[in-house]
Amino acid sequence: MFKHETVLLHETVDMLEVKPDGIYVDATLGGAGHSEYLLNKLNEQGHLFAFDQDQTAIDNAKIKLAEYSDRVTFIKSNFRYMKEALNERGIEAVDGILYDLGVSSPQLDERERGFSYHQDAALDMRMDQEQELTAKKVVNEWSYQDLIRIFFQYGEEKFSKQIAREIERRREVKPIETTGELVDIIKTAIPAPARRKGGHPGKRTFQAIRIAVNDELGAVEDSLENALTLLKPGGRISVITFHSLEDRITKYLFQEATKGPDLPPGLPVIPDEYKPDFKLATRKPIVPSEEELEQNNRARSAKLRVIEKIIK
């Protein structure tokens, strides 16, 4: 069964200031924890559109949310196509959108999905099991320079060159097939003193490959830009990020959206059309409480940012 600890459950949904008859989007259905809590706040006129590119997540959510089946629509799609998918269903604007950008724990924990550096499995890492690009293709077919780039940019890995060089050396002998082989390569490439510090040596490289396989950062940027155009006045977007790369994108897009145009200083009144369309609902990101961290260690790096479309 699809078990998933929902992070910042109440904060994320409560910050949307849910209207019982509103239209809402869960961009990252996952274990459906946020969806369930949100649906509980909707009446029969309200509706939730829930996106996930993983059919297993949708199948499990249909069971979990069966009592709300009349007010939820499941859409199997990457959230970067949210706007088109909603427009196709006659939805031009919504009251709120939430994102939980963590990889849902069941995907990490299912050995055959190939996300985990703790379990030996085929190199896969696809969120969408129908797409062609896999971790195996990245590791065996991408150039030395491209591997360095993703390890450094997406994994912030100090030993990117050494790991890419060792991958190149091994794959000339035979294709790299499994997560276990990749972990062995990483351990060989990273100097022993560094291996003993800062958690599992494979963590950063595996994160980088997962982001590359699923084009996660490109999808986040595309989706958030579209989400801002979908909001009704007074509507809000809640975004939970788990690492600095996604948080940087979210923070930048939200800051840009809340800026007005450059106007000469000292204007007595700023016309409405020059005022920004959005405001930050939280000056600083909301982080999990000590109590939540005790119950769910995966929440440690979570940050929640919220933006609101201004009613003019």
UniProtKB/Swiss-Prot annotation:
S-adenosyl-L-methionine binds at residues 32-34, 52, 79, 100, 107. Pfam families: Methyltransf_5 (PF01795). GO terms for biological process: rRNA base methylation. Its EC number is 2.1.1.199. It is found in: Cytoplasm. GO terms for cellular component: cytoplasm. SUPFAM superfamilies: Putative methyltransferase TM0872, insert domain (SSF81799), S-adenosyl-L-methionine-dependent methyltransferases (SSF53335). It comes from the Bacteria. Gene3D superfamilies: Putative methyltransferase TM0872, insert domain, Vaccinia Virus protein VP39. Keywords: Cytoplasm, Methyltransferase, rRNA processing, S-adenosyl-L-methionine, Transferase. One of its GO terms (molecular function) is rRNA (cytosine-N4-)-methyltransferase activity. It catalyses: cytidine(1402) in 16S rRNA + S-adenosyl-L-methionine = N(4)-methylcytidine(1402) in 16S rRNA + S-adenosyl-L-homocysteine + H(+). Belongs to the methyltransferase superfamily. RsmH family. PANTHER family: 12S RRNA N4-METHYLCYTIDINE METHYLTRANSFERASE, S-ADENOSYL-METHYLTRANSFERASE MRAW. Specifically methylates the N4 position of cytidine in position 1402 (C1402) of 16S rRNA. This is Ribosomal RNA small subunit methyltransferase H. It comes from Listeria innocua serovar 6a (strain ATCC BAA-680 / CLIP 11262).
